[in-house]
Amino acid sequence: MRALWIVAVLLVGVEGSLVEFETLIMKIAGRSGISYYSSYGCYCGAGGQGWPQDASDRCCFEHDCCYAKLTGCDPTTDVYTYRQEDGEIVCGGDDPCGTQICECDKAAAICFRDSMNTYDYKYLRFSPENCQGESQPC
């Protein structure tokens, strides 16, 4: 029961549709975004400051930058749809904002998959104290 409560807390107040993003990460990278990336490095999870610690953390940095470039969209509330065609994720639907958010999430999931060999457990639950200083620009 306690584990369900923790998951419920994680699902509240996180940028984007965490359920959709988690599903994309599972489909593309084959691993749980919540388990591996909800608190990793300087950029995976809430906020972000300093420099990305490795390629996996850079995926989260790029994801934050992708969201920052969206105009007139709110990744915290807008939802999206996608489909699979020949094993590929295709973002779509009638909502242009949803499609853009989906593309950001898809790019991050692909990045996680492609940088899996650089994942380093020393950055899991990385202290924000190690992420001080000026942030890298997008």
Swiss-Prot record:
It is found in: Secreted. Expressed by the venom gland. GO terms for biological process: arachidonate secretion; lipid catabolic process; negative regulation of T cell proliferation; phospholipid metabolic process. Binds 1 Ca(2+) ion. Its cofactor is Ca(2+). Pfam families: Phospholip_A2_1. Disulfide bonds join C42-C131, C44-C60, C59-C111, C65-C138, C66-C104, C73-C97, C91-C102. Coiled coil: none annotated. Residues 81-83, 120-126 form a propeptide. One of its GO terms (molecular function) is phospholipid binding. One of its GO terms (cellular component) is extracellular region. Residues 1-40 form the signal peptide. Snake venom phospholipase A2 (PLA2) that inhibits neuromuscular transmission by blocking acetylcholine release from the nerve termini. PANTHER family: PHOSPHOLIPASE A2 FAMILY MEMBER, PHOSPHOLIPASE A2, MEMBRANE ASSOCIATED. Heterodimer of an acidic and a basic chain. The acidic subunit is non-toxic, without enzymatic activity and comprises 3 peptides that are cross-linked by 5 disulfide bridges. The basic subunit is toxic, has phospholipase A2 activity and is composed of a single chain. This is Phospholipase A2 homolog mojave toxin acidic chain. It comes from Crotalus scutulatus scutulatus.
